[in-house]
A protein has these predicted regions:
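Hydrophobic/aromatic side-chain positions at a characteristic register within alpha-helices
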Residues: 46-47
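Conserved small-residue packing positions in alpha-helical repeats and bundles
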Residues: 42-43, 59
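TPR/TPR-like (Sel1-like) alpha-helical repeat modules
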Residues: 51-67
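Terminal alpha-helical segments
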Residues: 70-71
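A short secondary-structure junction motif
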Residues: 20-21, 65
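Basic DNA-binding region of bZIP-type proteins
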Residues: 1-19
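Long, low-complexity, acidic Ser/Pro- and Gly-enriched intrinsically disordered regions
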Residues: 21-33, 74-125
Length: 125
């Protein structure tokens, strides 16, 4: 196994441990968070160094996701332009609509993380 592959495996495992510890589930999708499937896929793709719609979306929302406590080690450079380009190639005239829909999903995901974080804080002794 190459060094990069070992690093990717370690990043995925660390993310799963963090999500399990914080939310009691190994991933966001099973928690039912809106956009959780996109964020799960994006985190795995980032760990693997893949440039996908999901990894670019997570990179684009990195500052908000980090503020809500989502562990992000590395992100893609210039994610907004790269995501627009990728969507333009795959969706043509629908690229702008899909871009907006993806942003709304990741924003809803971050809102759900925030609500969960605040709920846990208020329940703590």
């Amino acid at each position: 196994m190459t060094r990069e592959a070992r690093t990717a495996v370690a990043r995925r495992a660390a993310t799963a441990r963090w999500v399990r510890k914080r939310f009691g589930s190994p991933n966001f999708e099973t928690l039912g968070f809106p956009g959780g499937d996109l964020v799960d896929t994006g985190l795995c793709d980032l760990a693997d160094g893949k440039v996908t719609v999901e990894s670019l979306l997570v990179s684009l929302a990195a500052s908000r996701l980090r503020r809500e406590g989502v562990p992000l080690s590395t992100v893609h450079a210039d994610p907004e332009d790269r995501l627009c380009g990728l969507l333009s190639r795959s969706s043509g005239d629908l690229a702008h609509a899909r871009y907006g829909a993806y942003l709304r999903q990741v924003s809803s995901f971050a809102d759900a993380c925030r609500r969960t974080r605040l709920d846990r804080r208020h329940r703590a002794p």
